[in-house]
Amino acid sequence: MPELPEVETTLRGIAPHIEGKTVEAVILRQLKLRWQINPDLGEILSGRQVLSCGRRAKYLIVRFQTGILLIHLGMSGSLRIFTPSDGRIGRPDRHDHVDIVFSDGTVMRYRDPRKFGAILWYEGIEERHPLLEKLGPEPLSEAFCTDYLYAGLKAQKRAVKLALMDNTVVVGVGNIYANESLFRAGISPHRPANRLKKKECAVLVETVKAVLQRAIETGGSTLRDFVDSDGKSGYFQQEYTVYGRHNQPCLRCGGLVVKETLGQRGTFYCTNCQK
């Protein structure tokens, strides 16, 4: 599933190509995603100019003067950009569900083999969208700090990994990056969240920020379907220290990395290095 680094990579890829441009047409090949696409989306968007693009958690936001297009990549989604300078727009296949065509010939194509993503039109106040209004702080923002995390975990008895992946605590830290952050911070994913000391919260905050920033720099992780707006794979998976390394030697102590299920997600950790 695309997590925050993959969504941020996508944002940085599409924004320069569509900001300030006017939608000419929308081609809908498949309406049934996680939530059905409005069949009138083409009529709604045609003639509207993109003011800006942004991201909140794992949601991409395309802003117009009187509304936003909210895009979620789901389990396997990606956005590709085709420009007139490419010479030829790639021929769509059965997984290419939506094309947004701009007046200068640029095309933004949504691809989603598993169809768990979403493309939603909304004309209300952005921050009050039901999918956005209860989200926690961005992990790379100043709001996600030691004091915030320490206070937020005090009343939580559940495993710290589950708390870290809760979007009401902090957004965008999915399974891959939760595993990587906890390993690098030396904290067991099973530790009750309210047992973390303040200095451990400080280390964890710093580690989460560093892991996510590095993942963005390397274009995110491509394990199956994810590609950026140019169709290129990310390569942060080459830097994994624990995720996907069960029964392999720990890179710190040489012991075997363990894989268990926690909250229905694969959890990788070293019993020696993480306490």
From Swiss-Prot:
Keywords: DNA damage, DNA repair, DNA-binding, Glycosidase, Hydrolase, Lyase, Metal-binding, Multifunctional enzyme, Zinc, Zinc-finger
Protein's GO biological process: base-excision repair
Catalytic activity entry: Hydrolysis of DNA containing ring-opened 7-methylguanine residues, releasing 2,6-diamino-4-hydroxy-5-(N-methyl)formamidopyrimidine; 2'-deoxyribonucleotide-(2'-deoxyribose 5'-phosphate)-2'-deoxyribonucleotide-DNA = a 3'-end 2'-deoxyribonucleotide-(2,3-dehydro-2,3-deoxyribose 5'-phosphate)-DNA + a 5'-end 5'-phospho-2'-deoxyribonucleoside-DNA + H(+)
Pfam families: Fapy_DNA_glyco, H2TH, zf-FPG_IleRS
Cofactor entry: Zn(2+)
Keyword Chloroplast set for record: no
Active site residues according to the UniProt entry: P2 (schiff-base intermediate with dna), E3 (proton donor), K58 (proton donor), R265 (proton donor)
PROSITE patterns registered for this protein in UniProt: FPG_CAT, ZF_FPG_1, ZF_FPG_2
Sites where the protein binds DNA: H95, R114
EC number of the protein: 3.2.2.23, 4.2.99.18
Cited HAMAP family: Fapy_DNA_glycosyl
Subunit structure as annotated in this protein's UniProt entry: Monomer.
Name of the protein described by the UniProt record: Formamidopyrimidine-DNA glycosylase
